């Protein structure tokens, strides 16, 4: 009689899209991986990572906003211009809220039978990103990332489709709703600082982004052990399409000054990525961060990014108060759904 794990691996390999978790379980004793996961030489981590150097991404304490907001804004502005990524500490989200989020996500991927996971799979050709899946972007030359994922919206309530929320483990919904509640407070503060840093009123960037209509899209990335982490990537190099992305620490690599670097992260800090839409709103003053995710030979890695996105019909362009004769618009104003279509299909914006 097959074990549940064996059954799950067999099921995952017979699906229309083979799941990386299943491929990992079969290749774990090998010294090779399927060719579609082997990156070109100019992408392979072993060949392109600057070895022996670990970057210290800016760490910003956001607990003292009431005491010295000017200092906080300056730190966030500098990090957003120079790095496009920073870590916030003393953010107010209780450790147990983050731990519960991680616990239920891990249980979904590792304890729920494969057949049950497939019930909430993203349908081929679906317009929405939501659901359990494997491939996302149209990869160059058919190459794939060494990752399975689960997408679903966690805010606002009107945007949530619980069809894509796992029913098991039973505490999944509660853990995610609690995390969303706390995360919104952090996001509001970051939007305010980014707005003030551009010489705008504190509310202007949030309003330009859509205020209460901003969509919080959670993605759980599951990177199983990979026999050849020197050849594969979990997620290919990219910038996020979002306004900002908030995530619990994850071993992403950052491209800075012409090199790929490993980065030092603080446990239970919240990592902030500046995304494409804030770069557009700021007319290029803030920079979206170019990053990628590597994998590990011996252990599973997971991450929980939350992408703060416009609604699909929302139009995003440079904030009008930032535009004048000396600062003409550097980006087109367009509906977010059109931006996403172009980016996922590697078309010019």
Curated annotation (Swiss-Prot):
Alphabetic keyword roster: Cytoplasm, Dioxygenase, Flavonoid biosynthesis, Iron, Metal-binding, Oxidoreductase, Vitamin C
Pathway as given in its UniProt record: Secondary metabolite biosynthesis; flavonoid biosynthesis
Pfam families tied to this protein: 2OG-FeII_Oxy (PF03171), DIOX_N (PF14226)
Biological role stated in the UniProt entry: Catalyzes the formation of flavonols from dihydroflavonols. It can act on dihydrokaempferol to produce kaempferol, on dihydroquercetin to produce quercitin and on dihydromyricetin to produce myricetin.
Protein name, entry field: Flavonol synthase/flavanone 3-hydroxylase
Catalytic activity: a (2R,3R)-dihydroflavonol + 2-oxoglutarate + O2 = a flavonol + succinate + CO2 + H2O; a (2S)-flavan-4-one + 2-oxoglutarate + O2 = a (2R,3R)-dihydroflavonol + succinate + CO2
Source species of the chain: Solanum tuberosum (Potato)
Cofactor: Fe cation; L-ascorbate
A GO cellular component entry from the record: cytoplasm
